[in-house]
Amino acid sequence: MPLNPQVQGFLTSLAAAGAQPFHTMEPPQCRQAINGLMSMMPPSKAVLASVRDSHIPGPAGEIKIRIYTPTGTGPLPILMYFHGGGFVIGDLDTFDKLCRETAGGAGVIVVSVDYRLAPEHPFPAGLDDASTALAWARREAQALGCDSARIALGGESAGANLTAAIALRLRDG
């Protein structure tokens, strides 16, 4: 199956510019490169009531989170968002635009979690951070203006894996 023409064009542009392939880089270089690529995207046009960075207590120190609050009233649902990146790359800034668009478009409070990454923090560090963030959101839902009965988990790639693993942890007690 051929690549989408836009994706192929983007990859061709990267190669022509001499971009180093990710698989040849060390994790810190990959993180810097992906954030550089994401910063080239146009900014979000979502209108939000607020976006704020915070920290919550974690199993090995503080966990950074970013809370995206849409305009609207009443207790809103929460989406706990876990970014992708193969458990090695990605952070709050990498998927900032996506979180803004999701909060504004769906009318949900998005809590993006900056879980610890490998290889510096091997499994289950990221999963423990993600589980801790969910427990925090459940406790703090009312203070956030959220409905504690409407908390969803989501993410892509590694973030989707964390979502599934948390669901299994909750099921299994």
Model-predicted regions and their roles:
Residues 1-67:
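A glycine/proline-hinged amphipathic helix-loop "lid/cap" segment
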Residues 58-60, 71, 82:
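A generic beta-sheet turn/junction motif
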Residues 75-85:
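Short beta-strand element of the alpha/beta-hydrolase
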Residues 83-86, 115-122, 155, 159-160:
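Conserved phosphate-binding and hydrolysis motifs of nucleotide-dependent enzymes
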Residues 91-92, 98, 106, 111-149:
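Catalytic nucleophile-loop/oxyanion-hole region of alpha/beta-hydrolase
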Residues 132-173:
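Primarily recognizes the serine-hydrolase "nucleophile elbow" in alpha/beta-hydrolase
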